[in-house]
Swiss-Prot record:
Binding site for substrate: E100, G101, T102, Y131, R176, P177, R178, D198, G199, D200
Protein name: D-fructose 1,6-bisphosphatase class 2/sedoheptulose 1,7-bisphosphatase
Quaternary context: Homotetramer.
Residues involved in Mn(2+) 2 binding: D97, E100, E225
GO biological processes: fructose 1,6-bisphosphate metabolic process; gluconeogenesis; glycerol metabolic process; reductive pentose-phosphate cycle
Manganese found in the keyword field: yes
Family statement drawn from the similarity comment of this UniProt entry: Belongs to the FBPase class 2 family.
Pathway: Carbohydrate biosynthesis; Calvin cycle
Binding site for Mn(2+) 1: D33, E57
GO cellular component: cytosol
Length: 345
């Protein structure tokens, strides 16, 4: 799968990032997302595969493109027999976020990117559109920190794993009212907090790389993005745990059902009998082979954002593989018309 699709998925996120970056700073978050969706879908439909969106832009009735259950790839066409040999057919599940951090793009802020994860059919958890409590940490802490422990306990363990004092640790938390007590506990324990407005996928992945000055992600965010983060951390060997949040009193946003009991019933209808289950990265991204790809839209911790020059653009992307145990940073110059010059830096 990696040798066949590795380069292709880089081009998918690159095209989405370039399209979205053209709307950077214009205050139009919906447009920035829409053009990324269109570009990502167009490029995926040029790939020799039969792909199924398991995490996308929403349910079929709510999303015109890249909706959950949509099939993409050349081998989904009506005339697919002319192009696809059944014996060589690659069937994959796909999780996408064409513009992770739409507000960041709209207001010209750092940290947005186009992301996707793929695995063989059945290899990615089809997360409901709920919230998820998340804990991400570096490979050294894998299996040692635990989402059921307090932040104070986890920070002590994390410090020991990284041979740092708690005061030297930086924890990323989304700046939301629901995290007021968590933020205070982290500070009381002695660690430092980096608050972000959006984009916790980037924060989770950054835990897997030394030198980012991000040592953990804690708190509650969207469940679909949790699966994408888990896929990346599975490839990196980092620690990731997620637990679905079904109690509206916890998030206080009105974006999930109004009743706790109703949400539990909805999860049961989706085949989730234990709503309190804690999922590991290997359970959220359980496939034999998992690939993750991201391309910076605006500058971030790991990648530069899209830079335009006359006649083209320059992108920085990341592709991580569970199969080859590699993380490749890809610097690409896109020549779209005869340029006056090529941007080298």
């Amino acid at each position: 799968m990696e040798s066949t699709l590795g380069l292709e998925i880089i081009e998918v996120v690159e095209q989405a990032a370039i399209a979205s970056a053209k709307w950077m700073g214009k205050g139009e978050k919906n447009t920035a997302d829409q053009v990324a969706v269109e570009a990502m879908r167009e490029r995926m439909n040029q790939i020799h595969m039969r792909g199924r969106i398991v995490i996308g832009e929403g349910e079929r009735d709510d999303a015109p493109m890249l909706y959950i259950g949509e099939e993409v790839g050349i081998c989904t066409r009506e005339d697919a027999k002319a192009y696809c040999n059944p014996e060589e057919l690659i069937e994959i599940d796909i999780a996408v976020d064409p513009c992770e951090g739409t507000n960041l793009v709209a207001y010209g802020q750092n940290g947005s990117m186009a992301v996707l994860a793929i695995s063989e059919k059945g290899g990615l958890f089809a997360a409901p559109d709920f919230y998820m409590k998340k804990l991400a940490a570096p490979p050294a802490a894998k299996g040692k920190v635990d989402i059921n422990k307090s932040a104070t306990e986890n920070l002590k363990i994390l410090g020991e794993c990284l041979e740092r004092t708690v005061e030297e640790l930086v924890v990323v938390v989304m700046d939301r009212p629901r995290h007021k007590e968590l933020i205070q506990e982290i500070r009381d324990a002695g660690a430092r907090v980096r608050l972000i407005s959006d984009g916790d996928v980037s924060a989770a992945i950054s835990c897997g790389f030394a030198g980012t000055n991000i040592h953990a992600l804690m708190g509650i965010g969207a469940a679909p993005e949790g699966v994408i983060s888990a896929a990346a951390m599975r490839c990196l060997g980092g620690h990731f745990q997620g637990q679905l949040i079904y109690d509206p009193e916890v998030v206080k946003t009105g974006l999930i059902g109004e009743s706790r009991e109703g949400n539990i019933a909805r999860l049961k209808e989706m085949g989730i009998d234990d709503p309190d289950r804690v999922y590991t990265d290997s359970e959220l991204a359980s496939g034999e082979t998992v690939l993750f790809a991201a391309c910076g839209i605006t500058p971030g911790t790991l990648m530069e954002g899209v830079r335009f020059f006359h006649g083209g653009a320059r992108t920085q992307s990341l592709v991580i593989s569970s199969q080859s145990k590699t993380a490749r940073f890809v610097d690409t110059i896109h020549i779209q018309e005869q340029p006056k010059y090529i941007e080298l830096k």
